[in-house]
Amino acid sequence: MRSVDRPDAGARPGVQLVLATWVSVICFWAWNLVGPLSTQYAIQMSLSANQQALMVATPILVGALGRIVTGLMTDRFGGRTMFIGVSLASIVPVLVVGYAAQIGSYPMMVVAGFFLGVAGTVFAIGIPFANNWFAPERRGFATGLFGMGMAGTAASAFFTPRFAKSFGLFTTHAIVAVALAATALLCAAVLRNGPRFLPNTASVLPKLKAAAKLRVTWQMSILYALVFGGFVAFCNYLPIYTKTIYDFSQVGAGERTAAFALAAVLARLLGGILADHIVPKYVVLAALAGVAAQTLIAVFRPPADLWTGLTFIPLAVALGIGTGGVFAWVSRRAPAGSIGSVTGIVAAIGGLGGYFPPLVMGATYDPVHNNYTVALVLLVATAVLLFGYTAIFLPAREPSPLPSSPRSAR
């Protein structure tokens, strides 16, 4: 039995990267199906703010923790097998979420949303996959382009409410399920592992322990928890935020969330490119400063629409540049045979960074004054602390990439 797909040096790197990015778009769309319709569900199911926040946050949790497993499995089986597997595994949860929405069952929605998180693990596959196709000096661009798969979040925010209005809740989810199946077939036909891919057949636990012992793993995890976690949290909670603070319709909130997500996605590519030409530390520092400044402005609830746009779009750009810069940093510093393992941990912590903010926002919302001041101030403080940590403790000159241990390179 063949457990690993052989690398194919004849395939074109650009085609492989674009297809991998497409897989990410569809999986991110599936992963973010709940958020854009959350205000409708809150009315339909008579949910409290905390119940609504839990419903939105649950897929994020599994999408975060599952990245550790998919990262490890990608080191062993390669990106092709894992992309196909995650696409297929996401189909049933998507359909069950649609059915739960159709019948108005909150318990079923939360349980199905838990398994929907599988779609969010796709990110831990794409980073090592891209690294296996591109030389180190091009990996910032490659990981940045793959990161544009986060556009699936924008697509979900923009199209999901419209599809639900035109076709109904279950049919909307069925459309995404069909897209996942078609994507899996396309991967089977076209996608190949890169020529640098060597299966890491070491036992899972030693690989995970080895990655966890690397200082770079935790340095990058802390940073990614803020920038990617902030992106995920805002993209999932912004429909609720804009409806609550500005009383936008579900479609209007979706349009603004889509603009936020798209700005972050485009900025992620910019962050990766900048990190290829500038020391990544400075890219990340600029991003953290932008996050702190723009979130502080948001505390004062600028009026819609011009001033909110001038607040949240630059915030999205800062988060996007930060995500691109951090992962370009990871791809340069992680050991070659453990990139998937390190990526899995970093991506998991980043996802967890997106899990807690919706819960915090739901718990700290002030209905008397109609604001989320406490949650936003906490984000400002965290960004400032990480700016200081990065500026003082992380060196501007990067150490050379660490060699893989003999055991992990087997």
Functional labels for PLM-detected ranges:
Residues G66-G78, A267-V279, Y365:
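Helix-to-loop junctions at the C-terminal end of transmembrane segments
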